[in-house]
Swiss-Prot record:
GO-annotated molecular function: 3'-tRNA processing endoribonuclease activity; ribonuclease P activity; tRNA binding
Function field: RNaseP catalyzes the removal of the 5'-leader sequence from pre-tRNA to produce the mature 5'-terminus. It can also cleave other RNA substrates such as 4.5S RNA. The protein component plays an auxiliary but essential role in vivo by binding to the 5'-leader sequence and broadening the substrate specificity of the ribozyme.
Protein name in the entry: Ribonuclease P protein component
Catalytic activity: Endonucleolytic cleavage of RNA, removing 5'-extranucleotides from tRNA precursor
EC numbers, comma separated: 3.1.26.5
Assembly, per entry: Consists of a catalytic RNA component (M1 or rnpB) and a protein subunit.
Length: 112
């Protein structure tokens, strides 16, 4: 499955405005149907979470978790997904972030 990145501020704002949100203690997920044949992934980590090293690590963990699980979880195509890290995600392991990502995708009902 192809996964592209959401990079532009306007694209993030569109997902926030029109999308539906799901949350747990570590992450928030916004989902918006983009009417394309691909999924697009955006990751946002606020400065409240920590310094740049911490924020970039969390971004990498979320992206890797989604990449490894997207085929396994059989996520449907045609969605914009934006993950927002909460302050509690600071210092969490890959396993905890991975479980959080899986949980949110299940909540959103994005299985084929």
């Amino acid at each position: 499955m192809d996964v592209y990145r959401i990079k532009k501020n306007a694209e993030f704002r569109a997902v926030y405005k029109r999308g539906k949100s799901f949350s747990n203690n570590l992450l928030v997920l916004y989902v918006y149907m983009n009417r394309k044949n691909v999924n697009r992934l955006g990751v946002s980590v606020s400065k409240k979470v920590g310094k740049s090293v911490v924020r970039n690590r969390i971004k990498r963990l979320i992206k890797e978790s989604f990449r490894l699980n997207s085929d396994y979880m059989k996520v449907e195509n045609g969605y914009d997904l934006v993950f927002i890290a909460r302050k509690a995600s600071n210092g969490k392991s890959y396993v905890e972030i991975n479980n959080s990502v899986k949980n949110l995708i299940k909540k959103a009902g994005l299985y084929k």
